[in-house]
Amino acid sequence: MVANTSMRLNQVAPVPIQLEDHGPNQLEPTHISDVLVGEHHTIKGENGQSYVVWAIRIIVNDSIYSSIVLYKRYREMEAFRNKLLDEFGNEIPPLPPKDSMSLQKLTNPLAWLEERRKGLQWFMTNVLLNPRWQRSTVVREFVLG
């Protein structure tokens, strides 16, 4: 009985497939349309030291389904800003201060981290949504590297 069923299945012609693209015009250049600096994650390094990485969600072409999520340390964002300064000069906005040993960081670390997140959000929004900077090699390497 099973052999007979599989024979009948083999005799059925496949349904033709037609691919349709309902997305944006492929000739339009890709652009960053939004950026969200989200939660932080504390990572324990190989040497036992802990450090914080930030989740950065980059929305591409106004579609929440086309997004890239990065996890970056503050020092990586600092290096990114320095490369932008080399290419574009002092037009680049500042990052929030490093504050490695601030009183607020020691007494209320969650409030300090939220202030840091807001500062990083402001920086990333001003840099990545600027049409002049977002197409630069520096931004491409930061996002895709």
Swiss-Prot record:
Cellular component, GO annotation: endosome membrane; vacuolar membrane
Primary location recorded for the protein, binned into one broad class: membrane
A Pfam family that the UniProt record links to this protein: PX
Keyword Iron tagged: no
Family affiliation: Belongs to the YPT35 family.
Function: Recruits the lipid transfer protein VPS13 to endosomal and vacuolar membranes.
Name of this protein: Endosomal/vacuolar adapter protein YPT35
Protein species of origin: Meyerozyma guilliermondii (strain ATCC 6260 / CBS 566 / DSM 6381 / JCM 1539 / NBRC 10279 / NRRL Y-324)
